[in-house]
C-alpha cells in the first residue's frame, strides 16, 4: 500500500502550550475618549437644532434667509458628520 505524503505541519514539532508560539498583541481597551463622544453628539444635536431653527424662524434671521435651501444641506451635513463619527466609537 502506498504511503501518504507528509505535509510540513505534520513534521513540525508540536508544542505542549499552543499559546507559547503566538506573539502577544497589546490591545487598547481604554475605549473612545470622552471628547470624541461629546463632539460626535454635538454634531448631531447642532445639525438637528439648525434644521429646527430654520423651519421655525429661518426667514426672520437674515443670514439663514440668504442661505435658502442650503440650510438643509448644512443641517443634514452636520448630522451626517456625527453619524460617521459613530463608526470610530468603541
Swiss-Prot record:
Record membrane topology: Multi-pass membrane protein
Gene Ontology BP annotations: cell division
Family note: Belongs to the CrgA family.
Gene of this entry: crgA
Keywords per UniProt: Cell cycle, Cell division, Cell membrane, Membrane, Transmembrane, Transmembrane helix
UniProt feature, compositional bias: Polar residues: 9-22
Protein name in UniProt: Cell division protein CrgA
Role according to the record: Involved in cell division.
Upper classification of the organism: Bacteria, Bacillati, Actinomycetota, Actinomycetes, Mycobacteriales
Originating organism: Corynebacterium glutamicum (strain R)
UniProt superkingdom: Bacteria
HAMAP family xref list: CrgA
Cellular compartment(s): Cell membrane
Any single GO CC term annotated in Swiss-Prot or TrEMBL for this entry: plasma membrane
Chain spans, region Disordered: 1-25
Transmembrane segments: 38-58, 67-87
Xref: Pfam families: CrgA
Amino acid at each position: 500500500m502506498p504511503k501518504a505524503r507528509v505535509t510540513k505541519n505534520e513534521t513540525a514539532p508540536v508544542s505542549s502550550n499552543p499559546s507559547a508560539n503566538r506573539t502577544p498583541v497589546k490591545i487598547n481597551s481604554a475605549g473612545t475618549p470622552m471628547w470624541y463622544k461629546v463632539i460626535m453628539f454635538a454634531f448631531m444635536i447642532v445639525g438637528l437644532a439648525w434644521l429646527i431653527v430654520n423651519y421655525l424662524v429661518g426667514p426672520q434671521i437674515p443670514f439663514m434667509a440668504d442661505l435658502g435651501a442650503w440650510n438643509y444641506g448644512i443641517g443634514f451635513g452636520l448630522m451626517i458628520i456625527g453619524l460617521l463619527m459613530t463608526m470610530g466609537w468603541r
